[in-house]
């Protein structure tokens, strides 16, 4: 056990444990944490404005339907309100177009941290700061994506720019804007990172069809694990926002181009096809959970579109 800990320590810090060497290896961690702390503090500056004697208030219209969804989930967890009569009143609106995972996560956190008995003031406070939390959390996968292609220094520079930029991302992640937009950014970025990692592992370990036929799970363990993770990440994105099915479309286009490129250059396309088949199977199966209509509807509702599109990628991967 001690040898394993020592090996792990050396993998992180290296055999050269001088102060300069250690700083070079881990400097990005405190810098990234400082940037995240700055972003979070900047987004919470006006918190007191949204806390009144009559409860909490929100900025804009959209946060109110999530307020109703989360309030319903607090009383009926994990169920969410299937229909929102107040949006587009008096006709109402099918609430699933907003996504429900965001409300379930926030409601679950409120219930967990209040031991199942939250006060209205505490529940309102968590809703007020939920968007800043998700916005700052999105920095982590964004950093790893940038570091994967450009290195740690440029990745930190990019996060620094993001921390200072005004615009849509800032507006959607400010305190008081209790909307699913911040969760969209987080889960989409997480999904992209998960696919990058899965493809990297597959290209390194080369899972081919013979290994599947031989049931060599030792050789398939890492590619299978990370491919399942990529599928789960894509599924979570669509649970948070049904039009997130666009991510499946984009990855499908990438897989088609990448598979063609591998064949053209004389490389085996099987590792890429393995990631596509496993991840899209997981995503497609996850979409059966919120499925509400057995027809191919629009992207704003959970329909067979969210099921068939990822499952269709499996057939493309096998061609």
Label every PLM stretch briefly.
Residues 36-40, 130-148, 153-218, 222-260, ...:
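Membrane-embedded helix bundles of polyisoprenyl
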Residues 70, 76-77, 92, 201, ...:
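Short loop/turn hinge sites at secondary-structure boundaries
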């Amino acid at each position: 056990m001690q040898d394993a800990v020592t090996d792990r320590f050396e993998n992180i810090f290296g055999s050269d444990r001088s102060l300069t060497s250690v700083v070079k290896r881990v400097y990005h961690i405190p810098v990234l944490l400082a940037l995240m702390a700055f972003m979070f503090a900047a987004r919470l500056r006006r918190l007191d404005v949204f806390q009144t004697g009559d409860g909490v208030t929100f900025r804009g219209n959209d946060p109110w339907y999530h307020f109703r969804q989360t309030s319903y989930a607090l009383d009926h967890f994990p169920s969410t309100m299937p229909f929102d009569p107040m949006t587009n009143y008096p006709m109402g609106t099918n609430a699933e177009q907003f996504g429900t995972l965001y409300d379930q996560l926030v409601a679950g956190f409120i219930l967990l941290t209040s031991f199942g008995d939250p006060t209205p003031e505490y529940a309102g406070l968590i809703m007020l700061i939920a968007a800043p939390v998700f916005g700052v959390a999105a920095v982590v996968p964004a950093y790893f994506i940038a570091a994967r292609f450009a290195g740690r220094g440029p990745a930190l520079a990019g996060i620094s720019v993001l921390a200072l930029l005004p615009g849509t991302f800032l507006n959607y992640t400010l305190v008081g804007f209790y909307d699913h937009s911040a969760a969209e950014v987080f889960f989409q970025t997480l999904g992209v990172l998960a696919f990058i990692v899965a493809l990297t592992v597959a290209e390194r370990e080369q899972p081919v069809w013979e290994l599947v036929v031989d049931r060599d799970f030792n050789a398939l363990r890492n590619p299978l694990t990370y491919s399942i993770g990529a599928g789960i990440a894509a599924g979570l994105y669509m649970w948070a926002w049904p039009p997130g099915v666009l991510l499946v479309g984009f990855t499908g286009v990438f897989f088609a181009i990448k598979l063609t490129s591998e064949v053209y250059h004389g490389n085996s396309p099987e590792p890429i096809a393995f990631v596509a088949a496993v991840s899209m199977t997981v995503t497609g199966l996850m979409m059966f959970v919120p499925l509400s209509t057995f027809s191919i509807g629009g992207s704003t509702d959970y329909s067979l579109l969210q099921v068939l599109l990822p499952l269709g990628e499996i057939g493309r991967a096998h061609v």
